[in-house]
């Protein structure tokens, strides 16, 4: 019995001769759903890198959902490329288990909405590969090294390439850090919502809340934000690579985002940030509170 069959149970793993075993993941798996969503939100980076690879980038591969009647299977394609309309073409990279309308090494074309993951190896390190990470996250820590050896990949938190805009919580964090790097106080404040930050802060205190109290607290937070930058300068995020391994939903408009920062000197820091979906888009409220 292979490693994955031992970890997940034999009925949940398809063992394939000469190829890595395939883990069967339930359709309602929250981690896998987020992995597929994350792959879609960062697909632009894969496409840009595929079009103009940087030194050290190789092994471009992309995962797609193949549908055969009532059956479906996520399969990796090698040698991927896109046409002018965004349709994907590639070579089936592993032997299908549940579908029979494609076969190993077959060249196929498929619509981009069926893309479920992508991966690049950058200087020996896995970038993307979110569905691989979702499976790995369920493995006991003592078995992770053996898993990495079996799939023959170096896997850490990676580097995520969300677009720096207010369309996602992660994009809002990157937008704020970009504003810091450009020393643009107005752009930084556009990534904030001091009223909501005040409401969130005060909600954890044993006191009566009203709009006037929240507004006064919001004004204090705003003044403190500006004063801190004037006295201490802008935080420096230049040369930092970011990963966002986890989202925690508080409610429909509040998410706590875990950010990993890889520093130029090789160091790593981790922070958890409270984000909020405001009328203008996602904004950054501040570090996670003790009750979140």
Task: Please provide the spans of the model-predicted regions.
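Short coil-to-beta-strand transition motifs
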Residues: 67-78
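Short beta-strand edge/turn micro-motifs at domain boundaries
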Residues: 119, 254-292
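Short beta-strand segments that buttress and anchor functional surface loops
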Residues: 63-67, 91-93, 255-264
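OB/S1-fold single-stranded nucleic-acid-binding modules
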Residues: 8-57
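Surface-exposed, charged secondary-structure patches
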Residues: 200-267
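Short, low-complexity N-terminal intrinsically disordered segments enriched in polar/charged residues
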Residues: 156-185, 194-200
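Cys-His-centered catalytic/binding microenvironment captured across papain-like cysteine peptidases
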Residues: 39, 72, 81-85, 89-160
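Long, contiguous regulatory modules within eukaryotic nuclear regulatory proteins
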Residues: 57-67, 240-244, 256
């Amino acid at each position: 019995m292979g490693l994955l069959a031992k970890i997940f149970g034999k009925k949940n793993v398809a063992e394939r001769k000469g190829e890595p075993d395939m883990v069967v993941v339930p359709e309602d798996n929250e981690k896998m759903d987020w992995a597929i969503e994350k792959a879609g939100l960062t697909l632009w980076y894969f496409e840009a890198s595929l079009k103009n690879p940087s030194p050290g980038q190789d092994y471009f591969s992309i995962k797609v959902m193949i549908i055969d009647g009532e059956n479906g299977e996520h399969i990796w394609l090698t040698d991927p490329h896109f046409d002018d309309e965004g349709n994907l073409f590639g070579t089936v990279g592993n032997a299908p288990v549940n579908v029979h309308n494609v076969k190993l090494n077959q060249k196929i074309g498929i619509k981009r909405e069926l893309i479920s993951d992508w991966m690049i190896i950058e200087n020996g390190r896995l970038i993307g590969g979110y569905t691989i990470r979702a499976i790995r996250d369920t493995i006991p820590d003592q078995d992770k090294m053996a898993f990495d050896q079996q799939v023959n990949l170096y896997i850490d938190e990676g580097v995520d390439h969300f677009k720096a805009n207010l369309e996602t919580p992660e994009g809002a964090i990157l937008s704020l850090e970009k504003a810091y790097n450009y020393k643009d106080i107005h752009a930084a404040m556009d990534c904030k919502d001091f009223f909501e930050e005040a409401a969130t802060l005060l909600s954890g205190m044993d006191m009566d809340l009203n709009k006037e109290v929240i507004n006064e607290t919001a004004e204090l937070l705003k003044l403190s934000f500006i004063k801190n930058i004037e006295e201490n300068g802008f935080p420096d995020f230049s040369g930092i690579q970011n990963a966002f391994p986890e989202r925690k939903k508080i409610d429909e408009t509040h998410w706590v985002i875990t950010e990993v920062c890889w520093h130029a000197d090789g160091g790593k820091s981790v922070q958890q940030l409270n984000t909020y979906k405001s009328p203008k888009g996602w904004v950054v409220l501040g570090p996670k509170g003790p009750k979140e």
